[in-house]
Amino acid sequence: MPKGTGKVIAQNKKAFHDYFIEETYEVGLVLQGTEIKSIRAGRVNLKDAFARIHNGEVWVHNMHINTYEQGNRFNHDPLRTRKLLLHKKEIDKLAGYAKETGYALVPVRIYLKNGFAKMALGLAKGKKQYDKRHDLKEKEAKREIARVFRDRQKM
């Protein structure tokens, strides 16, 4: 994350399991009033979210922001597509990568920075099944080593 970032609200752990994240970009979100209140309450899910470029604009799909509990008839649709704010050069660069096969734009995390909701958008390349298995084996080996060291310290 860039310097000066604030509180992390939600992370997309599935993105790190399914993709190699090559680059991340800090992007702004265009939100309605009840959406930012729900985000501050931590009621957001990035699990199946993805971003697409359409007519020179970046849009995030399937990002679920629960309705605000104290909201009334002006509450938002939880799964609506939301516009992301990037510089034109960044959009052009991402559009070039997104046209290549195997690349996707995936939300990595949502956080608050200076009172504004920001998203870390990752340029991701899909993992194969054997890559996922290899990562799980490495993770399990690290856990086992940490467990052995922890047991030795207790003795």
Curated annotation (Swiss-Prot):
Entry keywords, A to Z: Cytoplasm, RNA-binding
Top-level taxon: Bacteria
One Pfam family in the UniProt entry: SmpB
Any one biological process term the GO annotation gives: trans-translation
Regions annotated as coiled coil: none
MF GO annotations: RNA binding
Gene Ontology cellular-component terms listed: cytosol
Compartments it resides in: Cytoplasm
Protein family according to the UniProt entry: Belongs to the SmpB family.
Free-text function comment from the UniProt entry: Required for rescue of stalled ribosomes mediated by trans-translation. Binds to transfer-messenger RNA (tmRNA), required for stable association of tmRNA with ribosomes. tmRNA and SmpB together mimic tRNA shape, replacing the anticodon stem-loop with SmpB. tmRNA is encoded by the ssrA gene; the 2 termini fold to resemble tRNA(Ala) and it encodes a 'tag peptide', a short internal open reading frame. During trans-translation Ala-aminoacylated tmRNA acts like a tRNA, entering the A-site of stalled ribosomes, displacing the stalled mRNA.
Protein name: SsrA-binding protein
Recorded name of the encoding gene: smpB
